A protein has these predicted regions:
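Extended, low-polarity segments enriched in aliphatic/aromatic residues
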Residues: 138-176
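Glycine-rich phosphate/diphosphate-binding loops that line cofactor/substrate pockets in enzymes
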Residues: 3-19, 43-49
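Short glycine-rich or small-residue beta-strand-to-loop segments that form or flank ligand, phosphate
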Residues: 17-28, 52-58
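An acidic, phosphate/nucleotide-engaging active-site surface
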Residues: 63-132
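A short, gly/pro- and small-residue-rich
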Residues: 41, 127-148
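Short coil/turn connectors at secondary-structure junctions
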Residues: 14-17, 47-51, 77-79, 112-116, ...
Length: 176
């Protein structure tokens, strides 16, 4: 049961376009176990929902079909709509706003076309963003090359507050 929020079956009720953002091949995540549970809970609340699994690659290379099979298993790969994010396709990005740093935030259009966005992943210490987890699924996970490059710039990383476990004043975290 979730803490401090309604269950996914309640959150998904009445939502048609649901996006589940998940980590790519560079992150250890037991999606073969967790994704079926997430999908079942979503469909309890909205059986006919159109669900897209978006693999958050950031600037990493695309996740291969073999890696998708290893991560999710053959049933999910065969049955579900899975899209591998590509930050280098500007036609797939949409501008959202200006970030506190002054950089522009452009994200994968699928996020803006969704009624509900769910992020699957771990939260753990991160050496310059403070911590990994939910917000990193968005930035850098599903952002444009330009947005990620600004967020991960030498200037931002050089900040003494851009370090493990620090969120307050961390310029990388504050843009996320």
């Amino acid at each position: 049961s979730p803490i401090g929020t309604p269950p996914l079956s309640v959150l998904s009720h009445g939502k048609q376009n649901i996006l589940v953002i998940t980590s790519d091949h560079t992150r250890s995540m037991p999606s073969g176990i967790t994704m079926p549970i997430l999908l079942e809970e979503i469909r309890k609340g909205q059986p006919d929902a159109s669900i897209t699994i978006l693999v958050a690659t950031g600037l990493h290379r695309p996740t291969t079909q073999e890696e998708l099979l290893d991560r999710f298993g053959p049933d999910i790969v065969a049955r579900e709509r899975i899209v591998v994010h590509n930050a280098f396709q500007p036609e797939e990005m949409r501008y959202v706003c200006q970030l506190p740093s002054g950089a522009g935030l452009s994200v994968n259009r699928l996020a803006l076309e969704s009624d509900l966005i769910i992020s699957e992943g771990f939260i753990e210490p991160h050496f310059f963003a403070g911590f990994s987890g939910g917000r990193k699924s968005i930035l850098p996970g599903i952002c444009s090359q330009e947005t990620v490059n600004e967020n991960h710039s030498a200037k931002a990383i050089a900040s003494p507050l851009a370090t493990t476990g620090v969120l307050h004043g961390n310029p990388i975290h504050e843009d996320m």
